[in-house]
Amino acid sequence: MLDVAEMFVSINGEGTLAGQLAVFVRFSGCNLCCSYCDTMWANQSDTPCRTMTAEEIYNEICKMGIRNVTLTGGEPLNRNDIFELMELLAKDSRLYVEIETNGSIPLKPFLSIKNRPSMTMDYKLPSSGMEHSMYTENLNLLDSRDTVKFVSGSIGDLERAKEIINEYKLIDRCEVYLSPVFGKIEPSTIVEYMKQNQMNGVTLQLQMHKIIWNPNAKGV
């Protein structure tokens, strides 16, 4: 069984499909506690949830008629029945499935799924307070279907992101995004850093949904 905090249709606010419609399935609970977390409400023990089977979630997704599906959280890979749901979704050729994961869960077991979802993996930078939890071996397993996202709140974070990008040769491996911690660093500061360091192949990403709606809004 899986605890679903919310399920809704909106636009993808970030990533390679930014601006496209997607079904979002947000699971409750996370094994990390990042300083800038914008979905802390979904990680509380008393968060109202729907407890659903993998098949129930799949059927509800199908009824919505939207091709893109994003599994998010919380931390979706830290759920007992998530493998079953991933297999159900992967068998449906009508769907394009993306999983947002926090970088602390080993990805290898999930990468064996035939027609597996794409992985958007956070690498938690120093200002998150969670860099010590990163499972760095994941960075060697990603391919062109996948993305690594660095959410940066300071120049120090950007320096660390550059180190990781270079150490693991991420530009040659997968998509790479730099994103500002909302309200902590100006996007223009990130652009200047990218220019000064000739960060070819890196994409600046802004959270589109926070521009369109209230940054604290749920279900958007």
Feature annotation, model-predicted:
Residues 5, 11, 46, 133-136:
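A generic, residue-level signal for flexible/boundary positions that often mark functional hotspots
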